[in-house]
UniProtKB/Swiss-Prot annotation:
Ca(2+) 2 binds at residues 18, 21. It comes from the Eukaryota. Disulfide bonds join 20-26. The keyword rRNA-binding does not apply. Belongs to the osteocalcin/matrix Gla protein family. It is found in: Secreted. This is Osteocalcin.
Amino acid sequence: AGTAXGDLTPFQLESLREVCEVNLACEHMADTXGIVAAYTAYYGY
């Protein structure tokens, strides 16, 4: 079962940001398409 963005807690979203920010491409995508989309694109879910 997939988890929609609305189901993530602020703590979970912050964890995704911390993983993504070490990857400049992921961080850039997060700025334009959102953290959940960027994390999923680079790291799967």
